[in-house]
Amino acid sequence: VTVIEYVINDLKEDELAFHNPLHRQMLSEAAAHMYDSNFIAERYFLAHPDPVISKLSVDLINVRYQLSKYHSKSQKIVTDEERLYEMVPMLMINFKYAIVTEELKHMLYALQDPALAQDNEKCDSLMKRFNELKTVQSIMAKRLGDRVVLR
């Protein structure tokens, strides 16, 4: 399974999509080319005819930090490519965790609306959904291993 396939299937499974239209377009184009044997996403998007996508690609690919020569000489460096099998699932969970956290914030804001307090059915429904998402958030936090969910 390629990274593109994994990301597309993982997002479809949870009925998620990127909010940013550029990210959606890039994923859509990557999906269209994912079975092309000579398709290399990095090259494709860097040379994209749309300069905005090309610039975004540069920003996404650019390595922000470099390991000092002292450390790189004394130890074997494990590259991102070698760690894809562990990084991609973890990054997808991070992405979903951020979505769930944002949704919970919006729900809390909605629950503060006095008009909602007047409608018991809507309020109960929103509270039930809030509790479900809180449970999902807690499970995701445990899988990520380094998150503390405050109640």
Model-derived features: positions:
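Helicase-primase coupling helices
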Residues: 1-151
